[in-house]
């Protein structure tokens, strides 16, 4: 009896000791778990705030700490996960359940219930027996007492293993006391331990939290149990075994290889913590109730295996920033702590799948690590989905980047609570104008009306495609439009237009927590395997909202990625998946992708749209800028709004009003005034000053190609009439007169052509400055170009009109040769001659005469010898005669300019007949003696005020002398023999040529032929085309045939024509025909002749 009482007392005291130690270990685990959370929070805070000071060393060290904490098992809470079917029961299961309360509402340790649980577990559960020593048959027959002894032995081994890493004398002493029952000494030792360990749960928790946490070693390591395949006792190893506890290792960025745990039969695969599903837990109904209540009230709300089972395949940034929802809240949020904690643990209840043991996260969005109260701002980031791939690539290559941390978490900017916005917040880091004014809705997109209309209708009507391609130049809004389109597809609002920006989907995307929108780019920076993991992990997951994948800058995508993407597209065709490819050109995409996608082209933005956007941004940012400066920025951006915004931001940093010279200086341009001065010198053939001015401009570090491009732009503006010459016009020579005359416009067009040809040489040359100088010196045209009018330049085939002089006025050969010499001398100083001619025109006092000379006249040569002589050329005889009338006024103007007597020679341009190459010189020596009306009547023109004339076409009749000469020639033809026909033909040709010349010079009223009408109407003297000559020749042939056949219709066998008809045919001939023999005609008389000679007539 005494022995039984002693044994019962010993067992009770040992059970009390064991329960107290188990309670302390459990409380120590919770306290250490909280300390790890605090440390993780500090690491994340340092990561997001300290990288500005030392972005290399601090980021790398903190990144390593985050990796270690994420992989560490000390962060997992054993109190939040129920025991699995095949997993050994945790020591937390031995704690008191619901209802074990004492006075004051605090928990206490019930030794009897704990001993019952220990005995029940030791007697029933086959998993609890994981001691390292074999159990003898005598021990098995010893009944409950021996079972309790074994339990005590196991608990003490576990306790000793948790307190230290080495197996020493303490473990052996405790083992001896428990196994051999050494009487009163052991009882006294156990009673002292029980008195020291019996404390409440809150007191122990306070002691653990207050105590020093540096030397605390986590004992919450998940046991790894390996079951032997043979019979007898199982050799087990694990954290609760104590004898074979593995040593701790320091993590250096490497992953811990998980050991395989085998089943008792050896046929099952590895047992992971993720297999603790709810259906398996439901088998332990009694244990689940108490455990759930304790989890809801006292735990932090995170299962100890949460970091492994929640959203597999995610990076440590995802796990640290989203999965851990417990943190430190502010003081005002403490009242709602229990409610928020209970709601958070309810949301994080994991749903299981019947066919899989792995957990799948719910569709609800996870919260950030530190959840503040509703008064604080939300998290904002710039990237939604590419960071998952970026972080995986970061871990793989052991790299560091601020993009991963800043893009996922952002940096907080503290505000006053009165200006709090729950969804948006501003970072301390400066935001560029491009980021700050990024379009958020379709309405904000600029200059892409067709694309916006098409995509908006597709969202409203839910007519979605699988593949979209947005292509176009850079800075036109392709990526922004893709993001807006993705947000609109996932928007939950029932109103249009979408996206609304207020629904849960839009808010989650703005906060960076939307998993339905994944953005990847640029693709060339990431691994092919990571992209495939992203596609395989998200495409096949069913979701109510469409999943959108944005591949930005897919120009660098490899062929393997295209092949894999095409396969994924084929598999994802019936699902709610949308792929948006953003590139600059369609040439980089394979034909398989292009044939399946909807293509949207984003053209360059107009300068007016860019100016409007920049003006709006400048008003928002309070930037003082001129309107012309905005136009210059827009013109230099080449249709890219992003480039224009970056230029405006760069100019705003100068801190002064932005003007056009400031923009030109910043972007490396030359002012328009300097460019016009350079062009004026080059076109005026001022070689020395042109070279000096060019070197002065090149000293400002301007590229020769850029300078040539600016010169071409200025010339184009001048030709278009959009350039203003009001500044410094009096100092220039070529651009002195406004508007520019036609000849000067021709010079500018020729200069533009010269610059365009020189640009090709400039691109391939090493000495660009020399080629640019040569091109500018070639802008001054030569003499042939100066003497050639714009009207004659179109013909191309004719020679310059100044080479054909009037032979009647220059009868002497010496005079014409002297004029040629003077003309050659004048070509050397042609710019000076032109300036003198312009000064002469300005000296004229008659306005109509000044206008007339400017349009119709031009100076050919100027001889400033002993007898100064001026040669003037006019386009037509009428203009020449008008100039002769005002000879005195012109002479006075020349004498006023040259300050010496001058002789003026007025000439008319020669005209060339295209048919017979006969030069007609319209020179009338008697014009000087006639008055203007008489002169007009003589040449047969009605002159108008504006200088244009109207010609009257008449037929030339023959004089009496010509008529007698013609009759004599006909008589000779009748009487001459047959052998002299050649001489007769020659005489007739000479006669016809003289008649044709007389016809063109003498003009009287009469009848007209069809050929002459065509010639006069079309300006036969100026024609050189084949079709017009052909039409004239055909008309002449028809006229000749009609005239020859006219008398033959009167009587039969009449081969003679009247003299009048013969004369008409002779005048109209151009090519003479071979004369027919008249031998037969002499023998046979004509019926017409007989009828005329009959006396009856």
From Swiss-Prot:
GO MF term list: ATP binding; ATP hydrolysis activity; DNA binding; DNA-directed DNA polymerase activity; metal ion binding
One Pfam family from the record: DnaA_N-like_STI
CDD domains noted in UniProt: HLD_clamp_pol_III_gamma_tau (cd18137)
Region (Disordered): 1-22, 74-168, 220-293, 321-358, 400-436, 790-828, 913-932, 956-1003
Coiled-coil segments: 742-770
GO annotations of cellular component type: DNA polymerase III complex
Protein family: Belongs to the DnaX/STICHEL family.
Bias type Basic residues, positions: 245-259, 411-429
Keywords, alphabetical: ATP-binding, Coiled coil, Metal-binding, Nucleotide-binding, Zinc
Single GO BP term: DNA replication
Basic and acidic residues bias locations: 95-113, 137-168, 281-291, 332-345, 796-807, 818-828
Gly residues bias spans: 227-241
Residues annotated as binding Zn(2+): 491, 500, 503, 506
Stretches with biased composition (Polar residues): 10-20, 126-136, 993-1003
Residues at which ATP binds: 472-479
SMART domains, A to Z: AAA
Protein name, UniProt field: Protein STICHEL-like 3
Residue spans of biased composition, Low complexity class: 346-358
Segment forming the signal sequence: none
Domain of life of the source: Eukaryota
């Amino acid at each position: 009896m005494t022995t039984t009482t002693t044994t019962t007392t010993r067992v009770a005291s040992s059970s009390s000791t064991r329960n107290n130690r188990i309670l302390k270990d459990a409380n120590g685990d919770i306290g250490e778990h909280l300390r790890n959370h605090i440390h993780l929070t500090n690491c994340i805070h340092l990561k997001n705030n300290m990288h500005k000071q030392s972005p290399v060393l601090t980021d790398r060290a903190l990144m390593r700490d985050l990796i270690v904490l994420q992989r560490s098992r000390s962060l997992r809470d054993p109190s939040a996960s129920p025991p699995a079917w095949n997993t050994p029961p945790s020591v937390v299961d031995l704690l008191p359940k619901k209802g074990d309360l004492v006075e004051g509402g605090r928990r206490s340790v019930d030794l009897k219930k704990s001993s019952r649980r220990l005995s029940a577990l030791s007697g029933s559960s086959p998993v609890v027996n994981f001691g390292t020593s074999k159990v003898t048959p005598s021990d098995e027959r010893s009944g409950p007492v021996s079972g309790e002894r074994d339990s005590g032995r196991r608990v003490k081994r576990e306790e000793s293993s948790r307190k230290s890493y080495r197996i020493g004398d303490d473990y052996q002493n405790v083992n001896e006391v428990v196994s051999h029952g050494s009487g009163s000494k052991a009882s006294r030792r156990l009673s002292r331990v029980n008195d020291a360990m019996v404390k409440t749960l809150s007191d122990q928790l306070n002691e653990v939290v207050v105590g020093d946490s540096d030397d605390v070693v986590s004992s919450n390591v998940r046991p790894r149990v390996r079951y032997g395949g043979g019979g007898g006792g199982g050799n087990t190893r694990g954290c609760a075994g104590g004898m074979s506890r593995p040593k701790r290792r320091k993590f250096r960025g490497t992953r811990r290889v998980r050991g395989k745990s085998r089943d008792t039969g050896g046929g099952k695969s590895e047992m992971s913590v993720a297999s603790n599903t709810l259906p398996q837990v439901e088998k332990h109904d009694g244990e689940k109730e108490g455990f759930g209540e304790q989890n809801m009230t006292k735990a932090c709300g995170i299962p100890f295996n949460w970091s492994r089972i929640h959203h597999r395949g995610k990076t440590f940034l995802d796990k640290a920033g989203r999965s851990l929802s417990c943190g430190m809240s502010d003081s005002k949020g403490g009242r709602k702590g229990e409610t928020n904690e209970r709601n958070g643990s309810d949301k994080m209840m994991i749903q299981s799948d019947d066919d899989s043991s792995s957990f799948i996260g719910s569709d609800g969005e996870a919260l950030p690590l530190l959840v503040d109260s509703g008064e604080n701002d939300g998290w904002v980031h710039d990237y939604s989905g590419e960071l998952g791939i970026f972080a995986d690539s970061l871990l793989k290559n052991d790299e560091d980047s601020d993009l991963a941390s800043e893009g996922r978490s952002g940096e907080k900017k503290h505000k006053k609570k009165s200006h709090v916005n729950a969804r948006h917040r501003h970072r301390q880091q400066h935001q560029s104008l491009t980021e700050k004014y990024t379009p958020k809705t379709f309405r904000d997109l600029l200059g892409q009306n067709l694309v916006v209309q098409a995509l908006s209708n597709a969202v409203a009507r839910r007519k979605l495609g699988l593949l979209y391609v947005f292509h176009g130049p850079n800075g036109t809004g392709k990526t922004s439009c893709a993001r807006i389109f993705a947000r609109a597809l996932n928007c939950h609002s029932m109103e249009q237009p979408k996206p609304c920006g207020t629904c849960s989907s839009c808010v989650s995307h703005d906060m960076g927590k939307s998993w339905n929108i994944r953005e990847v780019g640029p693709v060339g920076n990431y691994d092919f395997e990571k992209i495939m993991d992203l596609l395989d992990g998200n495409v096949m997951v069913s979701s109510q909202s469409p999943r959108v994948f944005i591949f930005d800058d897919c120009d660098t995508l490899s062929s393997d990625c295209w092949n894999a993407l095409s396969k994924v597209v084929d598999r994802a065709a019936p699902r709610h998946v949308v792929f948006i490819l953003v590139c600059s050109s369609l040439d980089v995409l394979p034909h398989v992708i292009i044939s399946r996608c909807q293509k949207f082209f984003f053209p360059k933005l107009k300068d007016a749209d860019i100016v409007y956007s920049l003006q709006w941004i400048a008003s928002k940012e309070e930037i003082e800028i001129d309107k012309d400066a905005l136009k210059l920025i827009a013109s230099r951006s080449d249709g890219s709004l992003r480039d224009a915004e970056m230029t405006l931001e760069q100019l705003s940093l100068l801190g002064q009003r932005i003007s056009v010279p400031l923009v030109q200086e910043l972007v490396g341009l030359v002012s328009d005034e300097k460019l016009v001065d350079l062009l004026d010198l080059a076109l005026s053939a001022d070689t020395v000053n042109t070279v000096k001015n060019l070197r002065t401009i090149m000293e400002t570090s301007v590229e020769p190609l850029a300078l040539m491009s600016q010169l071409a732009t200025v010339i184009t503006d001048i030709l278009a009439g959009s350039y203003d010459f009001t500044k410094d016009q009096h100092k220039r020579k070529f651009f002195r007169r406004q508007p520019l005359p036609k000849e000067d416009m021709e010079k500018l067009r020729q200069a533009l052509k010269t610059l365009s040809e020189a640009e090709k040489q400039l691109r391939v040359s090493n000495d660009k400055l020399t080629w640019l100088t040569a091109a500018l010196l070639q802008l001054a045209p030569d003499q042939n170009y100066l003497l050639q009018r714009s009207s004659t330049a179109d013909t191309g085939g004719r020679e310059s009109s100044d080479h054909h002089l009037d032979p009647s006025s220059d009868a002497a050969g010496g005079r014409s040769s002297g004029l040629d010499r003077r003309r050659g001398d004048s070509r050397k100083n042609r710019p000076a001659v032109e300036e003198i001619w312009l000064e002469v025109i300005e000296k004229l006092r008659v306005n109509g005469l000044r206008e007339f000379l400017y349009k119709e006249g031009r100076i050919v040569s100027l001889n400033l010898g002993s007898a100064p002589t001026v040669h003037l050329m006019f386009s037509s005889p009428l203009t020449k005669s008008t100039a002769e009338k005002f000879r005195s006024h012109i002479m006075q103007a020349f004498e006023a300019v040259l300050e010496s007597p001058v002789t003026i020679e007025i000439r008319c341009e020669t005209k060339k007949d295209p048919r017979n190459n006969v030069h007609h010189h319209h020179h009338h020596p008697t014009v000087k003696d006639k008055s203007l009306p008489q002169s007009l009547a003589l040449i047969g023109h009605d002159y108008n005020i504006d200088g244009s004339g109207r010609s009257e076409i008449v037929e030339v009749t023959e004089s009496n002398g010509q008529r007698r000469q013609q009759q004599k020639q006909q008589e000779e033809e009748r009487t001459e023999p047959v052998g002299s026909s050649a001489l007769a033909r020659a005489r007739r040709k000479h006669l016809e040529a003289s008649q044709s010349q007389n016809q063109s010079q003498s003009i009287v009223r009469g009848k007209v032929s069809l050929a002459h009408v065509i010639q006069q109407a079309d300006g036969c003297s100026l024609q050189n085309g084949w079709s017009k000559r052909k039409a004239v020749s055909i008309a002449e042939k028809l006229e000749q045939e009609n005239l020859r056949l006219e008398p033959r219709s009167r009587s039969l066998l009449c081969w003679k024509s009247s003299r009048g008809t013969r004369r008409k045919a002779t005048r109209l001939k151009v090519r003479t025909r071979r004369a027919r023999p008249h031998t037969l005609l002499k023998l046979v008389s004509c019926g017409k002749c007989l009828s005329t000679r009959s006396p009856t007539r």
